Amino acid sequence: MIPTYKQLTPFLNLKTVQTDKFKTERFSVCIIIPPEERLMPVSRFVFHVLKRGCKKYPTQRELNVRLDDLYSAAVSTRFWDGIGSCKIGFVAEMLGDEYTDGSVFDGTVELLFDMLWEPLLDEKGYFTSKNVDLARENICDSIRSVINNPRQYALKRFWETMYEGDGCALPRSGTVELIESVSADEL
C-alpha cells in the first residue's frame, strides 16, 4: 500500500491508497487549522452543523435515507491533532463498488460535496437556527458527559497536563460557555 499524492489546486491535495485487502472504501475531506482556543471548537461546530443537512437533503432523515440507498454508507466528522496544526473534516466509509452496482463511491462523494458546498442556509445566508441549535445542544451534552467517562476524562487531563501552554492542551470541543456564545452568523 503505497500512497500517491496529486496537487489539485494550490490549496487542495489528493492522497490515494490502493489496496485489495478490504471490502470497503474510505474517503475523507479535511482542512488544516492552527490550534487556537476559539478556532478549533468553532471549526468543529461548523462541521457538526454541516452534517445536519444540505439543500438537496435538508433533514437528518433525508440524509439517512440517502446513506441507506448507498448500502448504508456512513459520514462522520473527525478531528486529528498534532503539534502546531489540527485537521478537521468529514470521513465517508462505504461498501466497495465491486460488491454493488458500482455507484456507491461516486454517490457518497457527491453527497459529501453537497454537504460541504451546498449547505442548508436561511434567507440571510447563515446556517439555519434549528441546525445550529441542535448541533450546539449535542456538542454541549458531549462536553458535559466527559466528566462521567473515566477514559475520556483521563485523556482530557493528559492532554491538558502534557501539553500545558501549547495549542494541543486546548479542549478540542471547546467549553460549554464558548459553544453557547457562538452565533449562527459567526459560523
How would you label these PLM feature ranges?
Residues 64, 118-144:
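Acidic/histidine-enriched alpha-helical segments
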Residues 17, 23-43, 60-114, 151-174:
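M16 family metallopeptidases and their MPP-like homologs
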Residues 43-52:
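Active-site SXXK
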Residues 51-59:
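Catalytic Zn2+-binding segment of zinc metalloproteases
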Residues 1-26:
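N- or domain-start disorder-to-order transition segments that initiate the globular core
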Residues 53-54, 116-120:
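A generic secondary-structure signal for well-formed alpha-helical elements
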Residues 139, 143-147, 158-162:
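Glycine-rich, mobile lid/loop segments that gate access to catalytic sites or pores
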Residues 1-7, 157-187:
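Histidine-acidic residue clusters that define the catalytic metal-binding segment
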